Amino acid sequence: MVRHFKMQIFGDRQPGYDGKRNMYTAHPLPIGRDRVDMEVTLPGEGKDQTFKVSIQWVSVVSLQLLLEALAGHLNEVPEDSVQALDVITRHLPSMRYTPVGRSFFSPPEGYYHPLGGGREVWFGFHQSVRPAMWNMMLNIDVSATAFYRAQPIIEFMCEVLDIQNINEQTKPLTDSQRVKFTKEIRGLKVEVTHCGQMKRKYRVCNVTRRPASHQTFPLQLENGQAMECTVAQYFKQKYSLQLKYPHLPCLQVGQEQKHTYLPLEVCNIVAGQRCIKKLTDNQTSTMIKATARSAPDRQEEISRLVKSNSMVGGPDPYLKEFGIVVHNEMTELTGRVLPAPMLQYGGRNKTVATPNQGVWDMRGKQFYAGIEIKVWAVACFAPQKQCREDLLKSFTDQLRKISKDAGMPIQGQPCFCKYAQGADSVEPMFKHLKLTYVGLQLIVVILPGKTPVYAEVKRVGDTLLGMATQCVQVKNVVKTSPQTLSNLCLKINAKLGGINNVLVPHQRPSVFQQPVIFLGADVTHPPAGDGKKPSIAAVVGSMDGHPSRYCATVRVQTSRQETSQELLYSQEVIQDLTNMVRELLIQFYKSTRFKPTRIIYYRGGVSEGQMKQVAWPELIAIRKACISLEEDYRPGITYIVVQKRHHTRLFCADKTERVGKSGNVPAGTTVDSTITHPSEFDFYLCSHAGIQGTSRPSHYQVLWDDNCFTADELQLLTYQLCHTYVRCTRSVSIPAPAYYARLVAFRARYHLVDKDHDSAEGSHVSGQSNGRDPQALAKAVQIHHDTQHTMYFA
């Protein structure tokens, strides 16, 4: 459009365009405030396409207000100014690369990282404009995502179905093969190869049940009549093409009711299609290996990216037009490393552990409050030839020894130790155990790799019978280690009501001087493209003064009829938060005999654009929960959003301060200046020791604070809570309550799994669970009353 109407309208201007409906110019266009309609012709598939475009002046974006906000003179940063700068800086990359969200990708050149299943890794970069103290910042980071490989459909099918040689596939696909293939290819764009240069593109809507040799469609004859013709016959008559694989199915493309069929062998996957479907575990593992970079390597890669002419640092006419200058150097700033809290253990010695770089050792220490296990059972779902009786006996003996050392003695042999097969045997076996063995405290379940048995064990144990279960992979039974057994004990002790360790009281922040409850909340959504599964909301609350024990509440989020934007917010806001918080406050009072005077609420899973729209209704809901208990009950609320999905990375300016094999910043590194918001209360905290790749600091945004925390107090409190996660002897990347809320929401996904489908992915949701029957959904995630007040999710 700009090229077509250069003389009449645009002249030498270089407008920035957001790809949707907004165009920005540095100076007014010579059209006044009138609407101008124009036509633009672009080359299409087979023929040119003409588009009607209207442009009209909307408003002036003031950069003066933005400068005042950056200097701290205004409380609100004008969003329209930030959006305009973002669009302008993204305009050139959008034309050069394939945009995905806020990142840009280009096809692999000089590297190839296959993920299997027709998918591959594309590398690129993330770019966004962010307000900071005194300046606007350009956030650049290396990025990677999965794309579908441009290849013939026959090859794609072979990858998806693990067919080594297509010539050996002489029979039609089985039903299960066809279903798997359909699931992968539905929604993808393909282009045809049998029409010469005219590579027409189509979107796949289905895969036919019948092969091309038998799949028929009504062919219109010249006399106006129609006759049934097979796809194979049609291609032979029309294109003189004898199909090589007439026994394979066809792709149904376009609209389903139009019956357009294409043989697999005349189709290719169109290049540049991002994979939005969930990666398999193997693909995720391959992706992590392909993308993990040590901190110094990532730093070098980002610097190279910025300085290279091919990316953001090159001559950009759009930046020049608007007078925008981007400095090539990374921002240098001063951070500080917070002191790690000491952790109190129990037993006779009452030992104290001092973390070193986010890690401490439990050897020679006993749990602060260990549980004695007198009645326990073992159910082995791995086949006997894979897990022999002598190996099982050795495992249980070693577990008992380690548990005794840890101060959680497992007394005697298991009362029951039997082999079992398949998810269907879980419920009858567990019912038998509950009836037969009075006071049964724990069932240890041995699993044969990834299996639907896990989901069924958790459904029956957590929701149906109220029994504590601990699953162990068979590989860890056959070849066990003290570390694995010790980690099992951490989980078992917490599940049964024990306390692994506590923060040393005299080192805790002053917020602990009065009763305080820590809440963690999260909402998990189904993978993209899976409209059948519901979103799940979870809220957990601390139940003691340490804080160590937590209780959980969980709900299925029902979707209402809204616009897409309203739906986005309604699915993210926790709908029944008032009742969930009320339950936790009542339970806190029952556990401690105190009413909390402060509520510290850590909220995970909220994106930057949704923060305020989610925070206000949730704050009101928390306040309502308090008032519903007593009219005058008004504890101070602090509402903190915890974000991990961002692209800010911290690197040590001084190489001597790098830590570990990956050269990351030390655990406890905190930044609350220079790159933080000019007027809002936020900070970055890297609370964990990076094991692989570059550590990602968590970003904390304080949206409401009745409790008047100083930045130092809240940073230290948050860091200490990262050391209270029961599953490991390491500080974790987000505070324990926020982490537990995620675990609870993910566990509820397993409670919804349909055991009648052999789903190793846990991907099938039972028939009533597709959003049509909210009552059945609510019942499916309802925890049994015997388990409700335990840390079943640990």
UniProtKB/Swiss-Prot annotation:
Residues 152-271 form the PAZ domain. Keywords: Cytoplasm, Ribonucleoprotein, RNA-binding, RNA-mediated gene silencing, Translation regulation. Residues 758-779 are annotated as: Disordered. It is found in: Cytoplasm, P-body. Residues 442-753 form the Piwi domain. Pfam families: ArgoL1 (PF08699), ArgoL2 (PF16488), ArgoMid (PF16487), ArgoN (PF16486), PAZ (PF02170), Piwi (PF02171). Its main location: cytoplasm. Disulfide bonds: none annotated. One of its GO terms (molecular function) is miRNA binding. GO terms for biological process: miRNA-mediated gene silencing by inhibition of translation; mRNA catabolic process; pre-miRNA processing; regulatory ncRNA-mediated post-transcriptional gene silencing. One of its GO terms (cellular component) is nucleus. InterPro entries: AGO4 (IPR028604), ArgoL1 (IPR014811), ArgoL2 (IPR032472), Argonaute_Mid_dom (IPR032473), Argonaute_N (IPR032474), PAZ_dom (IPR003100), PAZ_dom_sf (IPR036085), Piwi (IPR003165). Required for RNA-mediated gene silencing (RNAi). Binds to short RNAs such as microRNAs (miRNAs) and represses the translation of mRNAs which are complementary to them. Lacks endonuclease activity and does not appear to cleave target mRNAs. Belongs to the argonaute family. Ago subfamily. This is Protein argonaute-4. The lineage of its organism: Eukaryota, Metazoa, Chordata, Craniata, Vertebrata.
